[in-house]
Structure formats: structure tokens, C-alpha cells
Amino acid sequence: EGIRGDIAFAQSCLETGNFTFRGSAVTLEQNNFCGMGVTSNGIKGNSFATPQLGIRAQIQHLKAYASTAALQQACVDDRFRYVQRGCAPYVEWLGIPENPNGRGWAGGAGYGAKILRILTAILQM
């Protein structure tokens, strides 16, 4: 889909507490490694039949924010249609407060910057 896997992995580290799922709104059994569908406290978010489908949905959702290009594979992201396509072409704009379009993946301030800090730390290992 043209989305960087390292960015998706860093996002998954953020959303799952480095895959411990401590403090995460999602559980391992959901195969949801990005908090997809968690729109407020207490909401468990989307579930996927396999880890592969969960990761594909995450990549597709990131593409929805980053681009207006068509998907290359069948859509498995139930929330794809809710995204204003191309509204966050930069990782830094994934947080709604930082996005000049007022849109984004997460409402928390600095969301995209947190993803990039995790990625930087991984690359420095």
C-alpha cells in the first residue's frame, strides 16, 4: 500500500505498550495493534480474525490518512470510509491538535511525535 512498515510498527509499540498491552485499550486477542476503533475511554475498538488482517487494516488506515490513492488490496479496514482521505500526509499530523485540517488518528497532543520518537529509538539500537 506504500506505507512504511517501520512507522506502523512504531505506532503499534505506542498503542500496545510495546506489545505488553498494559494500559492499552486493546487486547492481544483482538489482533488490533493500533487502537483502531478506540474512540473514547472504555471502548475496546475493532477486532480482526488474524494478526495479518489486523496489520493490513492498520496499514490501510494509515494510507487513508496519508493519501487519496486507491487501495491496492481489498479493504479490510471497517473504519476506512470514515477518514477524510489525505488529511494527514505527515506522521506529525496524525494527532488532531497538530493537524491543520483538524483531523487525525488520535485526539492526544503529540501523537505523531511520539511515534517518531519510538522509531528514532528503535533505529538507534
How would you label these PLM feature ranges?
Residues 1-125:
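Catalytic cores of secreted/periplasmic lytic hydrolases that degrade extracellular macromolecules
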